[in-house]
C-alpha cells in the first residue's frame, strides 16, 4: 500500500475480512518514512514510498495500491513507471475498493477521481431505453396490480381509516421537488413533528404497514410517479426535501445522486440496510454513486431481480 491515507486503511481492512479474495497485504509505505514499524492495521508500515522499487523486488509484490495523503511531490513517478513496465499492477485505492465492494468510497475521494475515472456515461440511447422500459413496465404493473391495490386500500381503511395514501415532497432529478405517493403504512400524523428517517421496528408503523413494508407493497402507487416521469423503476431512492437540505450541507457530493431520476428500488436498497443516521446515509450514497457511475440496463435488471427476492421472501434492505 503506497501511502497511509484513510482510504488505503479502509481498503486493507476490507481485504483482511475477505479471505476469498486470496490477497495478501505485504505492508504500508509511509510518505515521509518517519513512521516505519508503526501499526495502522495488520501489517504495519514497512518502509517509505521512495523505497517502493526495492521493496517490490524484495517481497515479490505483484500489485501496488496508491493511497497517498498528498500526491503532489510525494509520488515516486519514475519508480512506479519502471514497475508498471516490468509487469507490476499499479492501482488506485478507490478504484480497487469500488471493484471489490460495489460502492465508491467517499473517504479521501478527490473530485478529480470522479471526472477522470471511466464511467458516469449517460448516453441518450441508454436513457431513452430506460425511459421506455419505465413506461411499459409501470403501465403494465398498474393494470395488473389494480385488484391488489384495491385489497390493500380496503385493509388500510379497515385498520386505521383514511387517508389511504401517504403523500410527501421528495427531491428528484436535477434537485426538483415532486410529490411521492405510497400506501400509508404509519398511523395518521406520524410525521407531524417534522421530517425524520424511517427506523427499524418503527413504532409509528401499523400492523398492516409492517406487512406492506416487509414485501415492499407500500411502494406500488409509485408506479404512477414512474409513469409521469418523476421517478424510474431503478435509481437512487428519493429523500425528503428537509432531510436533503440538511444532508447536502454535511455530506460532500450528496447532491450528485440527483443526476438521475430517483427509483422505486435501487442499488443501495438491495445492498445495504436501513439508513437512519448521517453515517449510514453516507454508506448508502457510496452505493448510489456506484450505480450512477456504472449505469446500464444490465445493472438495472440485476437490481430488479434482487428486489423480487425481497418481495417474494420478505427480506433485504430498505
Predicted features, each with a name:
Residues 1-13, 24-27, 162-187, 206-207:
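Membrane-cytosol interface motif
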Residues 33-38, 97-110, 166-204, 265-286:
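Short, glycine-rich, amphipathic interfacial segments at transmembrane boundaries or analogous
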Residues 198-261, 303-311:
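A short, structured surface patch at a secondary-structure boundary
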Residues 206, 228, 251-318:
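C-terminal terminal-structure detector
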Residues 44, 101-142, 164-168, 197-199, ...:
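Glycine-rich flexible loop motifs, especially short His-Gly-Gly/GGXG/HXGH segments used as catalytic or interaction
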Residues 125-190, 225, 297-318:
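A hydrophobic, helix-centered structural microdomain
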Residues 1-103:
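A solvent-exposed beta-alpha-beta segment
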